[in-house]
């Protein structure tokens, strides 16, 4: 497909041989939201190639959506599906969740409570749901060895600048002040105890 659209880099036979002979130590997987697709119903109108040349986005009308991030779909089951795909179709290589995060806007996170902590319980609940699915996948043989939740502090994004927040700590863009979120305390306990109790 890439060759058909003139998107492959120029390589020598030696380059190709080196790439083909190399082993992967482990794979890093970034996951935020599922992406559903359907066959194109309209003409592709860009003058350069993107994968959307072959499909359009599709929305599941019965889906569950994040009210704090552009109504992106929430589908914890997708973590299990990713793990099963790597296990069943890619030799069950070692991998880890290099990025997973739950976006909220500044207003949705609210202000710190009396204890000085920003209460982002919504984020914790969703992370728990996703990690339950990852635990289930590991129990079913997936070779996942770790999770890196995005991210330490609210940061700039290529897509949303500072519109969406992911951090364990809030960053005040005017003053540089940092305020801890409840999610940070939860994740610290999770990392220390290597688990949590869930009824999910």
What role is predicted for each listed range?
Residues 1-200:
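Non-catalytic scaffold segments within catalytic domains of secreted glycoside hydrolases
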């Amino acid at each position: 497909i890439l060759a058909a659209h003139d998107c492959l880099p120029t390589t020598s036979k030696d380059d190709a041989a080196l790439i083909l002979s190399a082993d992967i130590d482990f794979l890093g997987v970034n996951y935020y939201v599922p992406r559903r697709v359907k066959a194109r119903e309209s003409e592709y109108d860009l003058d350069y190639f993107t994968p959307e040349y072959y499909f359009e986005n599709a929305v599941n009308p019965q889906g569950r959506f994040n009210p704090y991030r552009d109504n992106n779909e929430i589908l914890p089951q997708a973590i299990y599906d990713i793990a099963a795909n790597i296990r069943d179709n890619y030799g069950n290589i070692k991998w880890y969740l290099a990025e997973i995060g739950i976006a909220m806007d500044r207003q949705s996170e609210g202000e710190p409570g009396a204890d000085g902590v920003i209460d982002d319980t919504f984020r914790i609940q969703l992370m728990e749901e996703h990690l339950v699915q990852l635990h289930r996948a590991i129990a079913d043989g997936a070779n996942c060895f770790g999770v890196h939740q995005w991210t330490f502090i609210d940061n700039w994004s290529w897509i949303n600048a500072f519109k969406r927040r992911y951090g364990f700590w809030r960053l005040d863009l005017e003053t540089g002040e940092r305020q801890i979120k409840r999610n940070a305390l939860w994740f610290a306990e999770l990392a220390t105890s290597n688990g949590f109790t869930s009824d999910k």
